[in-house]
Structure formats: structure tokens, C-alpha cells
Amino acid sequence: MSDDPKTLVSTDWLARHMSMPDLRIIDASWYLPDMGRDPKTEYDEAHILGARFFDIDEISDTRSALPHMVPPVEKFMSRMRAMGVGDGHQVVVYDGVGLFSAARVWWLFRLMGQSNVAVLDGGFPKWKAEGREVEDLPPVLRDRHMTVSVQNHMVKDVTQVAAAAKLKDWEIVDARSPARFKGEEPEPRAGLRSGHIPGSKNLHYKHLLNTDGTMRAPAELRQAFEAAGVDLEKPTITSCGSGVTAAILSLALERIGHRRHAVYDGSWAEWGMYDDLKVETG
């Protein structure tokens, strides 16, 4: 793969840059309830040297009834300052699956105007499988200011998505499994209808990944979007269950040079909750 410190870097790249003074590594592990894993416990047991733990559920808008929505700017700045992550840093984000929740935090940094951030391809599983060094000690943290400039074009709310679905001027791409998209399988969150946003396309995020949890090559990514019926000439809204795996689609779009994309932050956790919003099945 070609390393790009603004999107995706390999474990080899990270190993070569570990001594870079302005490198900041973030463990952004987050798991679905049925995975039966505790990200903070796993981080405390072992993480890449110097990694900080990013709590996706806590660094969010906890006033919202929806899960892990984008946090208020002041909260994000405060948490990053306390973690010692700020201006001038090259950030590398990883997770304990391979390439899963790390993409959400990559997108969140970019939403906040921080472009020097990349996902570690293959994540912690690949790092460990290669016998690279890990530790169980907390990092030494020093406050660092972060200048935030919110890129509002990178996120969409329910009203904007409803308008896009009606006007058909954006592609809406859903990262959930085909069974959930078609409404053949119930949603894991209680109280949600089954199905998908009218006119949306389905591209399960797993189709963008290799079996080892690394992202497929750009040519294969482009082919996957086209096979799903996505018109890459249009701007794209990515969606999923709660705004996590949608960011994998956004990362893939960025890798193929598609710059006009946004995440529907509320995703199906929001759309599936409101009876006045139309739902398609099949």
C-alpha cells in the first residue's frame, strides 16, 4: 500500500516514525455490545507505545439521546488538550479490530479541522501479529493546545439527509450489512424500524477490507463503490447504524480521491427512530 499520513499508514510506516517527537498515537477501540469486549480494559492491558485512549462514547455529545454524536467543540478541545494532542502533531489512530472504529475518530479529527491524521492499516491486531512492541503503562501527558476549525460540510443532520434523499442530488451509501439494509434482520438497537433510507445504496464496510483487516487497494475500493451502484461523480453521504462504520466508507472515498463526502452523524439510530421518515425495504 502507499502510505499517506492524511488517510492511511502501514505498521511499517508507524514503526519507522515512532521516534518522531510530534507523533501522537491514539487507541480508538470501540466495540458493539455483541462483540463482548471492553476497549478500556484491553487498552490498560496492552497498547502501542505512547498511545492515548480515546473514549468514543465519552468524547461525544452526551446530551443527545443518540449514541456517540459529534461532541461540542469545547469538549473536544478540552479532551485533546488533556490527552496532549494538538497543533503540529501527526496523529495515527488504531483500533482492536483492524479497521473499524478508528475511522470514526479519523473523521472526527478532520471534521475539527485537523488534517494530519491517519488510520493505522490493520490496527492493533496486525501490529501484534508482527511482534512489534507494546506496553501496559500510561503515557506521559503534557497539555497541548489544539486550534479547531469545524468543517461543517463533512457532517449531515437528519434534515439535510431527508432533503438529499428527496432531491437525489447526493448519493447516500449505507455501510450496514445487506440483511439489515433490506430489513430482513432486526436492528441491534431496540425500538428501531428495519430497512433503509429511500434511494440509498448498500455497501457493507467489510467489502472494503481484506481478510487481515487492512483496507483494499484504491482500484478495488473504486470497483466496490461502482458495483454498489454509487455514482462517484456525485457528492456522497455515508451512513450506518450509529455513525461509526460510515466513516470507513468516508476513509475509502478519500483514498480514491473522492473529496465531496459527509457522514450522517445520527445514521440509522436516528432515521429508524422517527415514524414520519420514510423507510424502504428489500
Which role does the model predict for each range below?
Residues 1-282:
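Cytosolic catalytic domains that perform sulfur/thiol-centered chemistry
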